[in-house]
Amino acid sequence: MNNLEIFEESKKYMPGGVNSPVRCFKEMGMNPPVIKSGKGVIIKDEDGKEYIDFVLAWGPLLLGHCDEDVVKAIKETSENALAFGAPTKLELELSKFMCENLDNVDMIRMVNSGTEATMSAVKLARGYTGKSKIVKFAGCYHGHFDGFLIEAGSGVLTEGIPGSLGVPKESVENTLIGLYNDKTQIKELFKKQGNEIAAVIIEPVAGNMGVIKANEDFIKELRSLCDEYGALLIFDEVMTGFRVAFKGAQTLFDIKPDLITYAKIMGGGLPCGAYAGKKEIMEKLSPCGGVYQAGTMSGNPVVMSAGLATLTKLKNNIELYDHVEKIGEKLQEGLIKISKENDVPLIINRVGGMLTLFFTELEKVNTYEDVKTCDNERFKRYFKHMLNEGFNIAPSQFEAMFLSVKHTEEHIDKFLDAFKRFAINEK
């Protein structure tokens, strides 16, 4: 069966033919390739076409597809352990590794996804503070938990919808919306309802309305307001953890969050998530405290082995981050040069190995409102051109591109050559 045949048959058994909406390429007006295999940064579809991958499973594969050390760990563990629903040494090893190597992490709880991590962190914050309301920011995406599906980023933003059917108003009545990088608005919000706020959750580097780094003074204001009103500050590092730096995005700011969520890279390509923070807060979790959260597959030994292999390799080869920064800078500078030479309005936001191309006339993209000025029709033309040229990029103006340690300068040169052909056609 070829790509089209598989996808058409998939529609008979899966809604839209996919298990996550953005994969169907609906907003791009085309069918997706059906991926068969991947190694390093090269993936191959069922038609036999190869692509240089800049999606990397939406961020987890910093080491590239099927890294030999990660695959070895998975194979060795799976020969003797798949799942027990019981304590294992591997979950201790990964938990200890993260607590000892990350800042502001005294204790950690393993879960199975980023959504589980963020929803559990919010529950814990509510249990710890005894308050109900949370603040999230328009354009930020924290998973598909009901309380987050309002003014969300990622696929919700891509499809141009305000939220989701099936989410009753009661589920979001305790969710307050902040404006990213707007100190005045967040101060007013706290002034009116600060005593009811349990937590502020934020992507310190947003990745689901495109890449936007929070302003330093904005993050400091959040920390100050949370301290003043007795709320917790939660950094959602599902995307940025171990990516923008080994210790994550919190190293970019002189700020200490109370809770941090992780996923993606920490699982080495397998389903994984975690939330972590100060001991006094984490011990409110059952069985130590009264905040209940559980999971049959949490701490799964195969996943723990993949995560431990991934993070250990990154720690022991910290220079890999310098390589990612180098090729990221080369890509960014090359794209800007080409766009200027061909009068294609373009802003590129990049933090380490994640970046977004914003097709906009603005001089900078720093807020959710800025993002909404982007030329989606031009992005669609760019996407289709690059896919035809053999590059896998996210099918949305509002998602990040990801780089890996396996990308080379040659891969970047090929991408720039293809982008130049696109830009010339846009004249």
UniProtKB/Swiss-Prot annotation:
<dbReference type="InterPro" id="IPR004639">
    <property type="entry name" value="4pyrrol_synth_GluAld_NH2Trfase"/>
</dbReference>
<keyword id="KW-0413">Isomerase</keyword>
<comment type="similarity">
    <text>Belongs to the class-III pyridoxal-phosphate-dependent aminotransferase family. HemL subfamily.</text>
</comment>
<dbReference type="Pfam" id="PF00202">
    <property type="entry name" value="Aminotran_3"/>
</dbReference>
<dbReference type="GO" id="GO:0042286">
    <property type="term" value="F:glutamate-1-semialdehyde 2,1-aminomutase activity"/>
</dbReference>
<keyword id="KW-0663">Pyridoxal phosphate</keyword>
<dbReference type="InterPro" id="IPR005814">
    <property type="entry name" value="Aminotrans_3"/>
</dbReference>
<keyword id="KW-0627">Porphyrin biosynthesis</keyword>
<dbReference type="InterPro" id="IPR015421">
    <property type="entry name" value="PyrdxlP-dep_Trfase_major"/>
</dbReference>
<dbReference type="GO" id="GO:0008483">
    <property type="term" value="F:transaminase activity"/>
</dbReference>
<dbReference type="GO" id="GO:0006782">
    <property type="term" value="P:protoporphyrinogen IX biosynthetic process"/>
</dbReference>
<dbReference type="InterPro" id="IPR015422">
    <property type="entry name" value="PyrdxlP-dep_Trfase_small"/>
</dbReference>
<dbReference type="GO" id="GO:0005737">
    <property type="term" value="C:cytoplasm"/>
</dbReference>
<dbReference type="InterPro" id="IPR049704">
    <property type="entry name" value="Aminotrans_3_PPA_site"/>
</dbReference>
<keyword id="KW-0963">Cytoplasm</keyword>
<comment type="pathway">
    <text>Porphyrin-containing compound metabolism; protoporphyrin-IX biosynthesis; 5-aminolevulinate from L-glutamyl-tRNA(Glu): step 2/2.</text>
</comment>
<feature type="modified residue" description="N6-(pyridoxal phosphate)lysine">
    <location>
        <position position="264"/>
    </location>
</feature>
<protein>
    <recommendedName>
        <fullName>Glutamate-1-semialdehyde 2,1-aminomutase</fullName>
        <ecNumber>5.4.3.8</ecNumber>
    </recommendedName>
</protein>
<comment type="subunit">
    <text>Homodimer.</text>
</comment>
<dbReference type="InterPro" id="IPR015424">
    <property type="entry name" value="PyrdxlP-dep_Trfase"/>
</dbReference>
<dbReference type="GO" id="GO:0030170">
    <property type="term" value="F:pyridoxal phosphate binding"/>
</dbReference>
